[in-house]
Amino acid sequence: MKKKFWVYDIEVFENFFCIVLEGVEDDDVITYMIHPSYRNDYDDMIKFLKQEGKAGSIFFGFNNLSYDSQVIEFLIQNEADFLSKKPIEICREAWMFSNALIHGQDNPGFRTPYPEFKQTLKQIDVFKLNHWDNPAKSSSLKWIQYTMDWYNIKESSISFNALIDTGDQIRETLKYCVNDVKSTKKIVLLSKDLIKLRMNLSRTYKINLLSASEPKISKELFAYFLGQKLKMHPKDVKALPTQKRTLIRVNDIILPYVQFQTPIFKAVLEKFKTVIIDPENTKNGFKHSILNNGVKTDYGLGGIHGCRASGVYESTSDLIIMTSDVTSFYPNLAIRNKWSPGHLDAQAFSEQYEWFFEERKKIPKKDPLNYVYKLILNSTYGLSNDKHSFLYDPELTMKITINGQLSLTMLYEMISVAIPESIPLMQNTDGLETIIPRDKVDIYMQVCAEWEKITNLQLEHDKYQKLILADVNNYIAVYDWKFIDHDSWKKMKESNPDYVYKVLPEGFAYAATKCKGRFEFSNLALHKNKSHLVISKAVYNYFVHDILPEDYIMTNKNIYDFCGGVKANSTYAVQIVCVENGKETVQNMHKITRYYLSNKGCKMHKMHKETGKIISVDAGSWVVTVFNQYEEKPFEEYDINYKYYLQRITREIESARGSQLSLLF
C-alpha cells in the first residue's frame, strides 16, 4: 500500500465517535463513525488505520500528539476487547478516556499514556511545530482560523457533554469536524516548508523532529553535535546537571573593554557594577533610565531600548539617517568571548557554537541548512535562560544581555563624541539609528571600525531616506535607493509590491521598507493579532506612498482587512448586545469572534464572569457586524463604517508624527 499524507480530526461524545480524514495531496475524504443506532465503523476504521500505519503514512493534526492520537491509539490498543463490545460501550470508554486526558493536562506532572514513539501511526502536530503551545504564542485552532482568514470560524453548536441522538446532530457534528480538518489542512499547506525541513532533519540525524518547534530543533541538534565532539550520547549531554547559582555579581561579568568617556555613561557603568542578581528572578532584577541628547534610554537585564520623540525623520541633501546592526549580536558575544554554560566543557561548547556561525556563512541563504544554523545560533541564547534546557545558565544569559547593552552604548557614545552634530534616533537590542551630516559618513564608518576592533564584533550598515517613528517598537523605515537592472526591477515589483519604485536618471531604483510592531501588515506570523489590518496598511500608504487615507480605504476591497478578532477566556465572556423594536437581547459569543465595524449592527463588549464588569471591545457608540462565516456580496452591502476606520487611521498618523513634524530639518 502506498504511503499517504492525511489531515484528520476526531469528535468524542458519550454515545458517538467520529474521525474525518482528508488527503493532503488530494481531496480524498474518509469518515468513520461509531453510534449505537446509526453506524458502527469500528472494525473498518481500525483495519484502515493499521494498514496506513504499516504503509508509513503520516497523520497531520492540531494538538493531535496530546489528544487525538492518544484517543486513536487507545482504540487501536483495545481492539481485541472492543470487537466484542457494543457501539455504546466503545463510545463510552473512548469518552471516559478523552475526559481523563483533558482533565489530566491541567496537572503539571501529567504525561500522555501513549508516547509518540510507541504509537501505531506516524504523527505530525502543526500546533507544536509552530510553537503555539508556548504561552507567548498561545493559539487555538479557532484563533488560527481567524488569523489566516478562514471562511468559517465554526464552533460546535452541540455541547460535548450532550448525547447525540438524531441524524441532524450527527450531520452537524460531522460538518464541524470537516471544517476543522479543512482549516488544519490549510495550516499544513502554509507550513509545508517547515514540515519538509523537519522531515529532512529527522532523516539526516535519526532524531524525531517531525513536530519540533524551533527551540526544540536547536536544543536537539546542539546536543547532537556537542555529543559528537565530547564523544557522548546526546541524551547524556542533555542529562548533565546544570550549575546551581545563588547570585550573580554583575561587576564580575562585565567585559574588560567596556569603558566610557562621558560622565553620563560612566555613571551607567558604575550603576551596573553595583547590581547583584537573583538567578531565580531576572525579570525584575534591575531597571535604569537616562536622558541623553533627546533620547530616553532604558537599561535592564534584557536588551537596551532607547528612542527619540515620535516623529517623521527624513534624510536631506545634507543629512543622512544611518542604521547599523551587530551581526548575530548575542551569538557572537558568546562566541568571541568564549562563554559557555558553566556546567559544560567551555572549549567544546565555544568551538561548536563558532562552528555553526562559520559554517552558516558558507551556505547560501536559500539553503534550508542556513536557516537551521541560524535557528541554533539564535535559540541558544534563549535556551540559556530556559530552566528546562540542558543549556540553562542564567549567568550566561546575563553576560550576553548586560555586555550587549554596554557594548552598544559604547558605540552610541563614540559616534556622539566623534560627530557632535549627530542626532541619535533609536537604540534597540542589537543596533542603532543616527542622523549624521553626509560629509561625516567616512568618520562614522571609521568610528564603527574602531568599535569592531575593540569588541571583536561586526556591524552591518544601511541608510534610510525616511523613518516614521512612533516608539522603539513601532516604526516604519524606508531604505535608501538601490539600483538594479530592468528585469530584476520588474521581478522585484511583482514579489514586493509595497516597496517604493522609481525610474531615476541613474537607472531603475527601488527602496525597500521595514515595518515593526503595530505597523506590520505583511507576512504576519499566524499567532499574531491582525485586527483591522486596513489601518496599518493605510498608515503605511500615507507615509510611504503619499496616498491619503480616505483614498486608500475606498480602494481596499478585502473585507478581511476590516475585520478584528476578539477572544473569550475563562475570565471574560464576549457578548453581543442588540436592540430591535426597543427590546435588548444579549448573546454570549463563542471563544473567537470575527467582526467589523458597520453602520448598523450590535454593540460588542467583554463581561467579567464573576464581577459583571463590562469592557467595550471598541470604545464609544460604534456597532459591529459579526463575520465568523464569510458571506460574499457586493462590497458596498457590507455596510462598513468608514468613519470609524478613518478616525483610527488619523489617530495613528498623528501619533507617529508627534510634535516634531520634520522640524529638525
Task: Tell me what each language-model feature is.
Residues 137-138, 158-168, 288-413, 417-420, ...:
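Helical catalytic core of nucleic-acid polymerases
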Residues 1-20, 27-29:
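Entry/capping segment at the start of metal-dependent catalytic domains
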Residues 29-142:
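Conserved DEDDh/DEDDy metal-dependent 3′-5′ exonuclease domain
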Residues 143-154, 378-383:
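Glycine-rich, acidic and aromatic/proline-enriched surface loops and short helix-turn segments
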Residues 243, 249, 286, 292, ...:
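C-terminal, non-catalytic extensions of nucleic-acid polymerases
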